[in-house]
Amino acid sequence: MNYNFNWTVIEKNIVPMLEGLGFGLLMAIIAITVGTIIGLLLAFAAVSKSKIARKLVQIFVTIFRNTPILILVYITYFGMPTIGINIPKVPSFVITLALYSSAYMEEVFRAGLEAIPKGIIEAGQAIGLSGTVIKIEIELPIMMKKVLPSMGNYLISLFKDTSIASAITVGELTYISKVLTTQTFRVFEVW
């Protein structure tokens, strides 16, 4: 079988492909930003003294980490309208991705918080700092240094997860590539 590559398909469609790439990156950045904030709050709740808070975080993290993201996307996009909540496809996907990422970020941040030596926290308490000041001024900077590599790795993984948006016809790179493949029959060049 002889296959003749035709790279003009890419040349003619580079703009929509780059737009899809940019849109996927934008969705990933929004989701990781929101997910990081929620994950940080969940991590502080996970290491708090409140048993109820710890248990609620554990349930949330267990559900979101153990459910495939495609199922979560389908529940958000197709399931929510059955109970009267209609969310457009892009916000639906970004919300799902943000909650999904917050469960993973919570684990990263919790590990970072647990790696902080207790003596540093006790030193802050000894000089009269409040619990909030200790968390913001002492724990947060130390933890961020420890978790930054994991966060970078997860951002890359989350960007790859944006391809799942094509399942609900969000126009990111994977969806645009599928459309181009259907229109041009140039599978190898597009992918």
List each language-model region with its residue ranges.
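Transmembrane alpha-helices and adjacent helix-loop boundaries
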Residues: 1-191
